[in-house]
Amino acid sequence: RLGPLPLDRDHVTALLPHRPPMLMLDGVTELIAGQHARGFKLLADGEPWVQGHFPGNPVMPGVLILESLAQLGAVLALATEPLDPARCDFVFLGVDKAKFTRPIRPGERLDLDVTVLQQRGGTWKLLGEATVAGQRCAQAELLTAILPRQPSPPRRES
């Protein structure tokens, strides 16, 4: 279902519901179901956050680093559980022990690593680490869950 490693952006897009500009994972390079995954995000000059965070000194927002790690965690969960990605969502429940130790800038490759600390039912506790050129930029424990997808309420026309 996942396809052979490495998974490219097309494979990631087939698994996750996220689309640009919120698709924060470009590839998966290593995956051991139920245990660990590695992936990456290539940061372009045209990323939506570049102009405003911060003008003249762009730095990737910490929440987007965490989102990148969570998306890699979702791929790991889909490799572990017999789930249909079209019928479930992988959602954040909480973040603990988040540390941001180095700014991440456009033009860099953000390497991502998630390890399962605990899994119970559809709830996952992951240790995530983000690095650039081998230097740790961020680390956090992510509490996530797999939930059945709910139909979207109908949109009201104005």
Which ranges hold each PLM region?
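Generic short beta-strand
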Residues: L127-E129
